[in-house]
Amino acid sequence: MAGVKDENVFVYLNDTNVLSSEFKTVGIIPKLKIDRTKIHKIKFSDYFEKVAFKSIMDSKLENKPGIYPHVTSTSLNNGVKFYSDFWNIKASKSDPIISINNDGSAGYTFIQTHDFSANSHVKLFKPKNNELNLIITCLLLTNQFKKIKYSFNQPTLSMLTHDFNYDVFVYFNWIDFF
């Protein structure tokens, strides 16, 4: 592509409503140094570490309004069901947390950038690399969960977030997940 610097890689998602040769642009990953002539293995655990936390039941916080989000498995409002006066998970814009819904709206992935609490219906992960583009990452993760039809299946979440190698082929300026 003319005018595109080599260090930029365009990321495209295959849309199931269009022909497989058509892709939607979702963003650019800057400064990605990668050999574009071969298939690469990418492991989720190379980029994220699981965050251990004590889950809080919704009923214990619903009647205690406040400024801290309570993250659940909803697909709406960045996964936030309500706000309370309690938080037990530290997050910030410079140190964000990724939440992945286990059930309910299974597979939805969100970025949490403020201190919050969460129930047991989500899994939390922290990026190992601060340069990772989290917006694109969330789009790619949600797309992968939908592709394998993830729902109510803990072994699948474990496979996707720890054991599974994504085959990634970089061809000129786009990435395709097999």
What do the predicted segments below correspond to?
Residues N8, F86, Q112, K149-L157:
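Short, tandemly repeated low-complexity microdomains enriched for cysteine and small residues
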Residues F82-L140:
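A short beta-sheet element
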Residues N8, K43, L134-I136, L140, ...:
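Exposed alpha-helical structural elements
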Residues M1-N78, V168-F178:
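Non-catalytic DNA-recognition/assembly elements of restriction-modification systems
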